[in-house]
Amino acid sequence: KAYGRQRIHPLVAPFLAAHPQVDVQLVVTDRVVDLFAEDVDLAIRITDTPPTGLAGRPLEAVEHIVCASPAYLARRGTPQHPSELTEHDCIYLGEDPSDRRWRFTQRGQAESVTVAVRGRYVVNHSEMRREGAIAGLGIASLPGFAAQGALERGELVRVLQAWRHDTAYSGTAWLLYPPNRFLPSRLRAWVDYLASAIPQG
């Protein structure tokens, strides 16, 4: 849901302004939608293995990062290795027991580490985790797109940058639609708009 709220929703108003003959119904959900059974024109799914039987275009990589406020790091110190997270308050998703087991792979190396984190604030909403981190409640696991603005403003600092934070919610954001050679012009306009507004990077 976070991707739809924070990356897709802000693009709806400018798209509708540019395409007055097109309407958009946006359904934000974390479940896998069956486009055929549910008569859905287009889905956006974060995955490294897009389903066969659907056409698709990659939008962008969705990476998760760990970050904290400057005040928290000044008070508690900055972890240099994932194993040091056990000495910190961590803010995590908490929808599944595996959400508190943070996995890391060292960039350019084979080393992989899984750390069982704990913290006083657990919340299943990325914007709330971000705000909790800004308030100094701990080190948060966040999608990069959710943290970007706060990082640019200096409200958050990224930690453990030498490590990739591997989560079940990381991957490539894919636009998926029925494999019809001739997409309706209104759907094609939305697909092209999203692909240009969210360039691969």
Residue ranges and their predicted role:
Residues K1-A55:
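Central regulatory/effector-binding core of bacterial HTH transcription factors
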Residues Q21-Q25, A110-R120:
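A local structural motif
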Residues D30, I46-T49, A68-P70, L142-F145, ...:
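Beta->alpha turn/N-cap motifs
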Residues G53-L93:
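Flexible hinge/capping segments at coil-to-helix
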